[in-house]
Amino acid sequence: MDLPGPRWKKGKDGKDFASLAAANPMSAIVSELKASFISSKPVAILSGPGGSAVLGVGPEQAVILNRAAFGHAIENATAQKHWFQLSPEEVFYLCHALNCIRVDSLDNKQMSEIELWDYFRSGSESFPEMYKAYAHLRLKNWVVRSGLQYGADFVAYRHHPALVHSEFAVVVVPEGAEFGNRCGRLEVWSDLLCALRASGSVAKTLLVLTISSSSKCELSSPDCLEQLVVHERTITRWILQQCREQRCEPSRDEVNREELIIEKESVVFNHWGVILGFTVLSGLLVYRLKFRQ
Protein backbone atom coordinates (compact mmCIF):
# COMPACT_ATOMS: atom_id res chain seq x y z
CA MET A 1 0.00 0.00 0.00
CA ASP A 2 1.50 3.33 -1.07
CA LEU A 3 2.02 6.01 1.57
CA PRO A 4 0.35 9.38 1.01
CA GLY A 5 2.69 12.12 -0.10
CA PRO A 6 3.22 15.53 1.53
CA ARG A 7 0.23 17.84 1.78
CA TRP A 8 1.64 21.25 0.92
CA LYS A 9 -0.16 24.34 2.04
CA LYS A 10 -1.10 26.98 -0.54
CA GLY A 11 -0.38 30.68 -0.79
CA LYS A 12 -2.71 33.50 -1.78
CA ASP A 13 -2.04 32.80 -5.45
CA GLY A 14 -3.40 29.28 -5.06
CA LYS A 15 -0.04 27.60 -5.63
CA ASP A 16 1.46 25.27 -3.06
CA PHE A 17 4.75 25.91 -1.27
CA ALA A 18 6.58 22.87 -2.65
CA SER A 19 8.81 24.96 -4.93
CA LEU A 20 9.59 27.39 -2.10
CA ALA A 21 10.63 24.52 0.17
CA ALA A 22 12.80 23.00 -2.58
CA ALA A 23 14.59 26.33 -3.05
CA ASN A 24 15.24 26.59 0.71
CA PRO A 25 16.14 23.11 2.00
CA MET A 26 15.97 22.60 5.75
CA SER A 27 19.56 21.34 5.85
CA ALA A 28 20.81 24.69 4.55
CA ILE A 29 18.67 26.62 7.04
CA VAL A 30 19.97 24.61 10.01
CA SER A 31 23.55 25.08 8.80
CA GLU A 32 22.94 28.82 8.62
CA LEU A 33 21.51 28.78 12.15
CA LYS A 34 24.51 26.86 13.48
CA ALA A 35 26.98 29.27 11.87
CA SER A 36 25.13 32.27 13.28
CA PHE A 37 24.74 30.88 16.80
CA ILE A 38 28.28 29.51 17.25
CA SER A 39 29.79 32.99 17.09
CA SER A 40 27.53 34.46 19.78
CA LYS A 41 26.46 31.34 21.77
CA PRO A 42 23.05 32.60 22.94
CA VAL A 43 21.98 31.49 26.41
CA ALA A 44 18.97 29.29 27.16
CA ILE A 45 17.69 29.49 30.74
CA LEU A 46 15.90 26.51 32.26
CA SER A 47 12.40 27.61 33.15
CA GLY A 48 11.26 25.02 35.69
CA PRO A 49 10.87 21.38 36.66
CA GLY A 50 9.10 20.55 33.40
CA GLY A 51 12.41 20.65 31.56
CA SER A 52 11.65 23.40 29.05
CA ALA A 53 13.92 26.41 28.60
CA VAL A 54 13.69 29.98 27.34
CA LEU A 55 16.21 31.16 24.75
CA GLY A 56 16.91 34.85 24.15
CA VAL A 57 18.22 35.93 20.73
CA GLY A 58 18.55 39.04 18.61
CA PRO A 59 16.20 40.01 15.74
CA GLU A 60 18.28 38.39 12.97
CA GLN A 61 18.81 35.20 14.93
CA ALA A 62 15.10 35.08 15.73
CA VAL A 63 14.33 34.99 12.01
CA ILE A 64 16.72 32.08 11.45
CA LEU A 65 15.45 30.22 14.52
CA ASN A 66 11.89 30.56 13.27
CA ARG A 67 12.84 29.40 9.76
CA ALA A 68 14.55 26.35 11.25
CA ALA A 69 11.37 25.64 13.26
CA PHE A 70 12.97 25.39 16.70
CA GLY A 71 10.78 26.31 19.66
CA HIS A 72 7.82 28.67 19.87
CA ALA A 73 8.17 32.43 19.89
CA ILE A 74 7.03 34.25 23.03
CA GLU A 75 5.41 37.61 22.45
CA ASN A 76 7.13 40.50 24.19
CA ALA A 77 7.17 44.28 23.97
CA THR A 78 10.88 44.77 23.26
CA ALA A 79 12.10 44.51 19.69
CA GLN A 80 15.80 44.10 20.56
CA LYS A 81 15.40 40.77 22.36
CA HIS A 82 13.28 37.85 21.17
CA TRP A 83 12.41 34.88 23.36
CA PHE A 84 11.68 31.31 22.33
CA GLN A 85 10.40 28.47 24.48
CA LEU A 86 12.23 25.23 23.75
CA SER A 87 11.34 21.66 24.64
CA PRO A 88 13.91 19.47 26.46
CA GLU A 89 14.73 17.65 23.21
CA GLU A 90 15.25 20.93 21.35
CA VAL A 91 17.48 22.33 24.11
CA PHE A 92 19.72 19.27 24.19
CA TYR A 93 19.86 19.04 20.40
CA LEU A 94 21.02 22.65 20.05
CA CYS A 95 23.50 22.18 22.89
CA HIS A 96 24.78 18.65 22.18
CA ALA A 97 24.28 17.92 18.47
CA LEU A 98 24.78 21.42 17.04
CA ASN A 99 26.86 22.81 19.93
CA CYS A 100 25.58 26.31 19.23
CA ILE A 101 23.91 27.44 22.50
CA ARG A 102 24.78 27.63 26.18
CA VAL A 103 22.37 26.50 28.90
CA ASP A 104 22.18 28.10 32.34
CA SER A 105 20.40 26.76 35.41
CA LEU A 106 17.78 28.67 37.37
CA ASP A 107 20.55 30.19 39.52
CA ASN A 108 22.40 31.41 36.38
CA LYS A 109 25.16 28.79 36.45
CA GLN A 110 26.35 27.31 33.18
CA MET A 111 25.49 23.62 32.88
CA SER A 112 27.63 20.96 31.27
CA GLU A 113 26.13 18.39 28.92
CA ILE A 114 26.21 15.71 31.62
CA GLU A 115 24.48 18.02 34.13
CA LEU A 116 21.88 18.92 31.52
CA TRP A 117 21.33 15.23 30.71
CA ASP A 118 20.81 14.41 34.39
CA TYR A 119 18.44 17.35 34.76
CA PHE A 120 16.23 16.26 31.87
CA ARG A 121 16.30 12.61 33.00
CA SER A 122 15.16 13.65 36.48
CA GLY A 123 12.19 15.43 34.91
CA SER A 124 11.29 12.58 32.57
CA GLU A 125 12.54 9.01 32.82
CA SER A 126 11.90 8.47 29.11
CA PHE A 127 14.09 11.39 28.01
CA PRO A 128 16.95 9.21 26.59
CA GLU A 129 14.78 7.37 24.07
CA MET A 130 12.71 10.45 23.28
CA TYR A 131 15.78 12.51 22.54
CA LYS A 132 17.32 9.73 20.44
CA ALA A 133 14.15 9.59 18.32
CA TYR A 134 14.03 13.38 18.03
CA ALA A 135 17.70 13.65 17.01
CA HIS A 136 17.31 10.75 14.55
CA LEU A 137 14.58 12.60 12.65
CA ARG A 138 16.20 16.03 12.94
CA LEU A 139 19.47 14.75 11.52
CA LYS A 140 17.47 13.56 8.51
CA ASN A 141 16.18 17.15 8.11
CA TRP A 142 12.65 16.49 9.35
CA VAL A 143 11.02 19.16 11.48
CA VAL A 144 9.88 17.54 14.73
CA ARG A 145 7.19 18.90 17.01
CA SER A 146 5.21 17.55 19.95
CA GLY A 147 2.48 15.12 18.94
CA LEU A 148 0.50 14.98 22.18
CA GLN A 149 -2.58 16.53 20.60
CA TYR A 150 -2.57 13.69 18.04
CA GLY A 151 -2.05 10.89 20.54
CA ALA A 152 1.62 10.46 19.58
CA ASP A 153 5.02 11.42 20.96
CA PHE A 154 5.99 13.60 17.99
CA VAL A 155 4.78 14.70 14.57
CA ALA A 156 7.22 15.01 11.66
CA TYR A 157 7.06 17.68 8.96
CA ARG A 158 8.88 17.58 5.63
CA HIS A 159 9.64 21.30 6.00
CA HIS A 160 8.46 24.27 8.07
CA PRO A 161 4.94 23.79 9.50
CA ALA A 162 3.87 27.02 7.79
CA LEU A 163 4.52 25.41 4.40
CA VAL A 164 3.35 21.82 4.80
CA HIS A 165 1.17 19.65 7.01
CA SER A 166 2.84 17.00 9.14
CA GLU A 167 3.12 13.60 7.45
CA PHE A 168 3.86 11.25 10.32
CA ALA A 169 2.57 10.68 13.82
CA VAL A 170 5.60 9.28 15.64
CA VAL A 171 5.42 6.78 18.50
CA VAL A 172 8.66 5.88 20.28
CA VAL A 173 8.96 2.27 21.46
CA PRO A 174 11.98 1.38 23.65
CA GLU A 175 13.24 -2.21 23.71
CA GLY A 176 15.79 -3.65 26.12
CA ALA A 177 16.43 -4.27 29.79
CA GLU A 178 18.03 -0.85 30.26
CA PHE A 179 14.65 0.82 29.62
CA GLY A 180 12.92 -1.09 32.42
CA ASN A 181 9.13 -1.04 32.56
CA ARG A 182 8.92 1.50 29.73
CA CYS A 183 9.13 -1.37 27.23
CA GLY A 184 6.06 -3.01 25.76
CA ARG A 185 4.34 -0.09 24.05
CA LEU A 186 1.98 -1.10 21.22
CA GLU A 187 2.35 -4.80 22.06
CA VAL A 188 -1.36 -5.02 22.84
CA TRP A 189 -3.49 -5.21 19.68
CA SER A 190 -6.00 -2.66 20.99
CA ASP A 191 -3.23 -0.11 21.63
CA LEU A 192 -1.96 -0.48 18.08
CA LEU A 193 -5.46 -0.08 16.65
CA CYS A 194 -6.04 3.05 18.73
CA ALA A 195 -2.77 4.56 17.51
CA LEU A 196 -3.65 3.72 13.91
CA ARG A 197 -7.11 5.22 14.15
CA ALA A 198 -5.83 8.34 15.89
CA SER A 199 -3.19 8.97 13.23
CA GLY A 200 -5.51 8.07 10.36
CA SER A 201 -8.24 10.41 11.55
CA VAL A 202 -5.86 13.38 11.16
CA ALA A 203 -4.43 12.24 7.80
CA LYS A 204 -1.07 11.08 9.15
CA THR A 205 0.89 7.87 8.74
CA LEU A 206 1.86 6.08 11.94
CA LEU A 207 5.65 5.93 12.24
CA VAL A 208 6.97 3.65 14.99
CA LEU A 209 10.57 4.28 16.05
CA THR A 210 11.95 1.34 18.01
CA ILE A 211 14.91 2.30 20.21
CA SER A 212 17.23 -0.53 21.19
CA SER A 213 20.84 -0.88 22.30
CA SER A 214 23.56 -2.48 20.20
CA SER A 215 25.35 -3.42 23.44
CA LYS A 216 24.77 -3.05 27.15
CA CYS A 217 24.82 0.64 27.99
CA GLU A 218 24.06 2.96 30.88
CA LEU A 219 21.47 5.66 30.26
CA SER A 220 23.01 7.84 32.96
CA SER A 221 25.35 9.50 30.45
CA PRO A 222 24.82 11.05 27.00
CA ASP A 223 27.56 8.70 25.77
CA CYS A 224 24.87 6.02 25.52
CA LEU A 225 23.42 7.81 22.46
CA GLU A 226 26.12 6.30 20.26
CA GLN A 227 25.03 2.79 21.29
CA LEU A 228 21.31 3.33 20.80
CA VAL A 229 19.91 2.10 17.49
CA VAL A 230 16.73 3.37 15.81
CA HIS A 231 14.52 1.13 13.65
CA GLU A 232 11.83 2.80 11.53
CA ARG A 233 8.50 1.15 10.76
CA THR A 234 5.46 2.68 9.10
CA ILE A 235 2.12 1.03 9.87
CA THR A 236 -1.05 1.57 7.85
CA ARG A 237 -4.57 0.16 7.96
CA TRP A 238 -5.87 -1.88 5.04
CA ILE A 239 -9.47 -0.78 4.47
CA LEU A 240 -11.33 -3.38 2.41
CA GLN A 241 -14.12 -1.12 1.15
CA GLN A 242 -11.71 1.63 0.17
CA CYS A 243 -9.44 -0.70 -1.78
CA ARG A 244 -12.42 -2.32 -3.52
CA GLU A 245 -13.95 0.97 -4.62
CA GLN A 246 -10.75 2.72 -5.60
CA ARG A 247 -9.91 2.50 -9.27
CA CYS A 248 -6.34 1.38 -9.76
CA GLU A 249 -4.35 2.38 -12.82
CA PRO A 250 -3.77 -0.67 -15.07
CA SER A 251 -0.24 -1.93 -15.50
CA ARG A 252 1.61 -1.80 -18.83
CA ASP A 253 1.10 -5.54 -19.38
CA GLU A 254 -2.63 -5.20 -18.79
CA VAL A 255 -2.82 -2.30 -21.26
CA ASN A 256 -0.92 -4.28 -23.94
CA ARG A 257 -3.13 -7.31 -23.33
CA GLU A 258 -6.30 -5.22 -23.76
CA GLU A 259 -4.94 -3.65 -26.97
CA LEU A 260 -4.14 -7.13 -28.37
CA ILE A 261 -7.66 -8.35 -27.58
CA ILE A 262 -9.17 -5.30 -29.28
CA GLU A 263 -7.02 -5.90 -32.38
CA LYS A 264 -8.09 -9.56 -32.55
CA GLU A 265 -11.74 -8.62 -32.16
CA SER A 266 -11.32 -6.03 -34.91
CA VAL A 267 -9.77 -8.61 -37.27
CA VAL A 268 -12.56 -11.11 -36.57
CA PHE A 269 -15.19 -8.42 -37.09
CA ASN A 270 -13.63 -7.38 -40.42
CA HIS A 271 -13.48 -11.03 -41.56
CA TRP A 272 -17.17 -11.58 -40.91
CA GLY A 273 -17.94 -8.27 -42.57
CA VAL A 274 -16.24 -9.40 -45.77
CA ILE A 275 -18.13 -12.71 -45.77
CA LEU A 276 -21.44 -10.96 -45.15
CA GLY A 277 -20.79 -8.47 -47.92
CA PHE A 278 -19.85 -11.22 -50.37
CA THR A 279 -23.02 -13.14 -49.47
CA VAL A 280 -25.23 -10.10 -50.07
CA LEU A 281 -23.61 -9.35 -53.43
CA SER A 282 -23.98 -12.98 -54.50
CA GLY A 283 -27.66 -12.92 -53.58
CA LEU A 284 -28.25 -9.75 -55.58
CA LEU A 285 -26.47 -11.21 -58.62
CA VAL A 286 -28.55 -14.40 -58.53
CA TYR A 287 -31.72 -12.34 -58.13
CA ARG A 288 -30.91 -10.20 -61.17
CA LEU A 289 -30.14 -13.24 -63.33
CA LYS A 290 -33.45 -14.83 -62.40
CA PHE A 291 -35.28 -11.57 -63.04
CA ARG A 292 -33.80 -11.28 -66.58
CA GLN A 293 -34.78 -14.83 -67.43
Swiss-Prot record:
The active site is at residues 157, 165, 204. The keyword Ribonucleoprotein does not apply. It is a single-pass membrane protein. It catalyses: pretRNA = a 3'-half-tRNA molecule with a 5'-OH end + a 5'-half-tRNA molecule with a 2',3'-cyclic phosphate end + an intron with a 2',3'-cyclic phosphate and a 5'-hydroxyl terminus. It is found in: Nucleus; Membrane. The keyword Lipid biosynthesis does not apply. One of its GO terms (biological process) is mRNA processing. The chain crosses the membrane at residues 267-287. Pfam families: tRNA_int_endo (PF01974), tRNA_int_endo_N (PF02778). Its EC number is 4.6.1.16. InterPro entries: tRNA_endonuc-like_dom_sf, tRNA_intron_Endo_cat-like_sf, tRNA_intron_Endonuc_cat-like, tRNA_intron_Endonuc_N, tRNA_splic. One of its GO terms (molecular function) is nucleic acid binding. Keywords: Lyase, Membrane, mRNA processing, Nucleus, Transmembrane, Transmembrane helix, tRNA processing. One of its GO terms (cellular component) is tRNA-intron endonuclease complex. Its main location: nucleus. SUPFAM superfamilies: tRNA-intron endonuclease catalytic domain-like (SSF53032). Belongs to the tRNA-intron endonuclease family. PANTHER family: TRNA-SPLICING ENDONUCLEASE SUBUNIT SEN2 (PTHR21227:SF0). Constitutes one of the two catalytic subunit of the tRNA-splicing endonuclease complex, a complex responsible for identification and cleavage of the splice sites in pre-tRNA. It cleaves pre-tRNA at the 5'- and 3'-splice sites to release the intron. The products are an intron and two tRNA half-molecules bearing 2',3'-cyclic phosphate and 5'-OH termini. There are no conserved sequences at the splice sites, but the intron is invariably located at the same site in the gene, placing the splice sites an invariant distance from the constant structural features of the tRNA body. tRNA splicing endonuclease is a heterotetramer composed of SEN2, SEN15, SEN34/LENG5 and SEN54. This is Probable tRNA-splicing endonuclease subunit Sen2. It comes from Oryza sativa subsp. japonica.
